Amino acid sequence: MKEFSIDLNAEGQRIDLYLSEQFEDKSRSYIQKIIKDGYVKVNQKPVKSNYRLSFDDRVEVTLPEAKEPDIVPENIPLDILYEDQDIIMINKPKQMVVHPAPGHYSGTLVNALMYHCGNELSGINGCMRPGIVHRIDMDTTGSLVICKNDKAHQSLSEQLKVHSIRRIYVAIVHGNIKEDSGTVNAPVGRHPTDRKKMSTHCKNGREAITHYKVLERFGDYTYIQCELETGRTHQIRVHMASIGHPLLGDEVYGPKKCPFKGLQGQTLHARTLGIIHPSTGEYLEVNAPLPEYFIELLDRLRNICR
């Protein structure tokens, strides 16, 4: 059971919206269902989804246990950047989901890892996310670290918590960014009305900082590098859109129609990943090579600008 004490910032907010912000991995419809089924109480009494919170309300939430399907190992090739007895660092391809979820119970990175590693994956995140300590979006490519044991998982989780992991992405964005470098410092949280999106305009956003640097300009497009100080869901996509430069191909935060035919999702690649190794204590860094589609797109943009 989880308990929340309502402060002045949340006063007057609908309870279903408030809880959707607290449980970012749950949909609003799921939250409304558990409220209807009596799993949510305010001051020890059941409420309806449209209940308006009052200052100092005590909210109790008991999440019902979900029946999780069996995850089947699948012989899916992995692009391995580094591997030892504690961790495996891979270059994730486009269109691959990191872990199983409704609608994606096969073909995920976890299915591939279970085949490659067998039982050598940490169990801290449960049977649906063995070894997974962080993730990137389905259409984002690049470097990820997976933990083979709980000791490694705890070490990497702590590094994520204190923002000591080095994460550098490259992206192509709409528009000509005038300054050569800059920082976006804007809290990121669940969008107030569209639960599938994140936003910089929300009541309970969490601190999010992205440092960007221009690598190349192509007139109407800019090739940039982004270094994360924090790692919120969709952080780079939301931050760049918030300053008027959404990622090319990102139909969620940018234009609905992509000018480049065949481009699937945002043009975003997790190039560099640097960690403190959980056993040796030494700094370890991998660099994931750009995927073919990204290289071809850069060549195309260079040719257009000649």
Language-model features: locations:
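Short, surface-exposed loop/helix-turn segments at secondary-structure junctions
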Residues: 199, 249-262
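Thr-Gly-centered strand-to-loop micro-motif
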Residues: 42-43, 99-100, 147, 198-199, ...
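RNA pseudouridine synthases
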Residues: 1-183, 187-189, 293-301
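Active-site flanking residues adjacent to catalytic metal/cofactor-binding acidic residues
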Residues: 90, 238, 249
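Conserved hydrophobic positions within beta-strands
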Residues: 80, 173, 211-214, 247
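The conserved catalytic core of RNA pseudouridine synthases
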Residues: 126-158, 166, 170, 185, ...
